[in-house]
């Protein structure tokens, strides 16, 4: 138990020193990370344009470099940027949700030029946390490159329950 308390005290001291140094640079307007985090918003209306492969690759690399428990990288990421495939996914989701209003499923994606789907490993209890960290890195790196995003939970119910998904 002593080791634990000493470690916590050491961590608190290191954090306090680190925070005071970071705070000064943020006051000077020089902390791009804090500015990026504080300015990011969910975007629900997209321009009719494509996102370049190099840009997508950079964003995904930022995502998979997120911290994760025991470096298990307990996720799978799928990226869809083909409008025909996106329409197929939307059609499957609408067919799997007969109570949905016509067009409401397509509306939830709001014309986004790219969709990314992140799956976690259900056998690892920290995987949902790891996937959340990955998602946050994706959204923040996209924002820093001038791309907006929105995190959607509603498609998850369909994707987890439909065999054709």
Predicted feature locations:
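Bacterial N-terminal signal peptides
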Residues: 7-16
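Acidic, surface-exposed loops and disordered segments
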Residues: 19-165
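Positively charged n-region of N-terminal signal peptides that target proteins for export
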Residues: 1-5
């Amino acid at each position: 138990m002593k080791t634990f308390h000493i470690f916590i005290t050491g961590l608190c001291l290191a954090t306090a020193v680190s925070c005071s140094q970071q705070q000064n640079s943020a006051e000077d307007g020089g902390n791009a990370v804090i500015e990026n985090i504080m300015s990011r918003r969910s975007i629900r209306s997209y321009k009719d344009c494509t996102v370049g492969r190099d840009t997508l690759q950079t964003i995904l690399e930022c995502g998979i470099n997120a911290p994760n428990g025991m470096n298990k990288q307990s996720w799978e990421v799928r990226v869809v940027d083909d409008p025909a495939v996106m329409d197929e996914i939307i059609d499957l989701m609408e067919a799997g949700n007969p109570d949905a209003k016509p067009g409401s499923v397509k509306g939830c994606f709001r014309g986004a030029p790219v969709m990314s789907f992140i799956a976690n490993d259900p056998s690892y209890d920290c995987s949902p946390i790891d996937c959340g960290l990955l998602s946050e890195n994706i959204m923040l790196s996209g924002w820093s490159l001038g791309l907006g995003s929105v995190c959607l939970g509603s498609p998850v119910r369909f994707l987890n329950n439909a065999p054709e998904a």
